[in-house]
């Protein structure tokens, strides 16, 4: 399951969200743009109004400098690698900023054992300039959602779907979150009619085709065929 964009691509306003896929696979969009000429050093905005991010998606957060040449470590909230590896225009939201500011992504690479990207932005040439961007968010316009492959879904589209037992039609509950894993998991808040155990509020359901064979966004429903005991044992 790949995640992408919901003002964050997973759960929450302002982050790119993520795409979710019931079986493995990757969809890459090559949208390469040339670096801007004569890049200028970036100076954080010193104002502090609340930003309006309705039209923006967060794809990552700058966590620290990397080395002495201005590279930056970014924690991704999107699992589209092209967001961090394909050169082109991105936007920076400074800690006290009201509007994301355009910036050119020059290079990027993934550090798999840390789940971080190391990127180079135009105009960030040394450690001090990189340090000034700690905590800033990388953004893209909300209209810039990558196309999804078959059996991939935007996380925002899955949140709120009702989950039903396919065989009986019984309402199980509502999807409240997506848990990234080897096979992503649907976190489902149980409907009161489905369980007599008041302590059990949610269950985790593997988002694989064998268990969730029907995803009907138009009808706002997912149909599941869980193996015996799954809905009880994973709580």
Swiss-Prot record:
It is found in: Cytoplasm. Pfam families: PRC_RimM, RimM. GO terms for molecular function: ribosome binding. Residues 1-49 are annotated as: Disordered. One of its GO terms (cellular component) is ribosome. The keyword Amino-acid biosynthesis does not apply. Residues 150-230 form the PRC barrel domain. Transmembrane segments: none annotated. Residues 1-19 have a biased composition (Basic and acidic residues). GO terms for biological process: ribosomal small subunit biogenesis; rRNA processing. Keywords: Chaperone, Cytoplasm, Ribosome biogenesis, rRNA processing. Binds ribosomal protein uS19. An accessory protein needed during the final step in the assembly of 30S ribosomal subunit, possibly for assembly of the head region. Essential for efficient processing of 16S rRNA. May be needed both before and after RbfA during the maturation of 16S rRNA. It has affinity for free ribosomal 30S subunits but not for 70S ribosomes. HAMAP family: Ribosome_mat_RimM. NCBIfam families: 16S_RimM. Belongs to the RimM family. This is Ribosome maturation factor RimM. The gene is rimM.
């Amino acid at each position: 399951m790949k995640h992408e964009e919901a003002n964050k691509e997973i759960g929450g306003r302002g982050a790119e969200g993520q795409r979710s896929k019931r079986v493995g696979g990757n969809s890459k969009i090559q949208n390469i743009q040339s670096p801007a000429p004569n890049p200028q050093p970036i100076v954080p905005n010193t104002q502090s109004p609340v930003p309006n991010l309705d039209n923006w998606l967060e794809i990552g957060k700058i966590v620290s400098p990397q080395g002495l040449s201005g590279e930056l470590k970014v924690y991704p909230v999107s699992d589209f690698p092209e967001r961090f590896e394909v050169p082109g225009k991105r936007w920076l939201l400074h800690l006290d900023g009201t509007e994301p500011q355009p910036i050119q992504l020059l290079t990027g690479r993934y550090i798999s054992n840390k789940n971080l990207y190391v990127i180079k932005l135009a105009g960030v040439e040394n450690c001090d300039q990189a340090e000034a961007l700690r905590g800033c968010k990388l953004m893209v316009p909300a209209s810039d959602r990558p196309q999804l492959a078959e059996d991939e879904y935007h996380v925002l589209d899955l949140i709120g779907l009702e989950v039903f037992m396919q065989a009986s039609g019984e309402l199980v509950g509502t999807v409240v979150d997506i848990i990234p894993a080897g096979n992503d998991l649907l976190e489902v808040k149980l409907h009161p009619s489905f369980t007599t155990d008041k302590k059990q509020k949610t269950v985790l359901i593997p988002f694989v085709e064998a268990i969730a064979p029907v995803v009907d966004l138009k009808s706002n429903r997912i149909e599941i065929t869980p193996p015996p005991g799954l809905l009880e044992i994973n709580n």
